Swiss-Prot record:
Classification of source organism: Eukaryota, Metazoa, Chordata, Craniata, Vertebrata
Protein name according to UniProt: Cytoplasmic tRNA 2-thiolation protein 2
Gene: ctu2
Record HAMAP family: CTU2 (MF_03054)
Coiled-coil residue spans: none
GO CC annotations on file: cytosol
Entry keyword set: Cytoplasm, tRNA processing
Protein species of origin: Xenopus tropicalis (Western clawed frog)
Amino acid sequence: MCEEEEVYCPELQDTTQGKSLGKTCMKCKESSAVLLIRAGDAFCKSCFKEYFVHKFRATLGKNRVIYPGEKVLLAFSGGPSSSAMVQQVQEGMSRDAPKKLRFVPGILFIDEGTTCGMSHEERQQNMSEVQNVLQQTGFPFYIVSLEQVFSLPGSILQRGVPEQRANYKQEVDRFMVQQQAQGETGCSDILENLAKLGVNVSESSRESDKMFQSTCRHPPDTHTQKLIQLFASAKTLTAKHQLLHTLRSHLILHIARTCGYSKVMSGESCTRLSVSLLSNISLGRGAFLPLDTGFCDSRYGDVDIIRPMREYSLKEIAFYNRLFHVSSVFIPALNTKVLENSSIQQLSEVFINRLQADFPSTVSTVYRTSEKLNVSKIDANQGTCAKERCLLCLSPLDTQVGEASAFHATQISHYISQKILMKFNDPANSSGKSCCQEGKCCKGPGYGDFCQPRALQAPSFVDMLCYGCRLTVKDLQSLDALPQYVLHEAEHRSRRIEMRKEIEEFLLDKDEENLH
């Protein structure tokens, strides 16, 4: 029997007290630790800086994708990760760096305030703060508005031709020989770097950069209204996130190509990539995980996206920025002050963060899983043909699968449901008459609302998209809100496909070409 005054368990005691206090640095074994990254990983301030810098250099060194003298564009968002990335590049080019970075950096900031409903004054204040931070780096920088996507050319959706480079070691040796021949002692100053590599830094060039930035910072009001209408047409916050990511990628690619940058550094951390992995799988982008979360994204051909901060967790970045006074700018985004179930991206982030709080190895486990994913040889060796690439994200199309697939079954189900819906909603079908008779199109005088030009073009437009982008476009109320360069490129590809169908019987297959 249970007694009223019986004690069933001893008094709880704090067993963790004193375990993390008074620890010495795990590296130098001398100084007192000032931070604890993980259980048992205590660092002093100087050793933590050495550890942080070494990890950045090692990530770049073991991949060897940035050649000496190459122009690299740093994508700066104002957040902690991109701020730490810019700081690492800045320190890598200082006079005190033992092994200086040998590329030429530039910085790009994209103002996305319109998507969050920010006023013109708030956007100008944010851009002023960003400009003050970027001016302290001494690197050339560009500040553009997201509205500039409405003035992009259609060629931005075409995959560029990769530049054929020599062996990495040969490029380094040739660069060192050029340095010795020119009698240079270092690359500490960015202006010396630009002059050494033949980049024009004259006053006329600086004035042209100022005019370029002025044009991009103050877009026309019509572009602002179009951007507002585009995001208003998205039914869900998930679609808005995907649409923003797509437009931002297009604008970064355009600036990189226009200004001659062959590499773009992005500041995604290990934590951010773990969230992206889960959300992308949920959004039907699992086929492109090696491109979306890997170190190097080469889908654009002539411009590669690299992620040198992917080895760092957000905790490490926060410690580094706090200890060494790295400036950052807080700018509200689409996911600022929203509910945890408002979008798939937000739900994935909350899920990862809560698991990480209870199980500290969650992020590293998910991240290490993504490292094992590689692009298949078929996708990697695909040509630059327009129909083989997604119209929006430029990834290899993952919809060219057999009939015995889940994608094909989903398409049949969608087609049948849409056909039944059109049968009941189409006034022409309900009256037993065709909407177009005797060769006359119903788009003439008096045609009904059920016959919209865009509705006829929608199927061919969707066929040019990957599965993930199809889900995003499905949440748009109208395709007319998309930028003109997207619609023009879709029309151009449609004409090429129709032309190829007309002459297909006269073309030789690859097997026939080999026989001849």
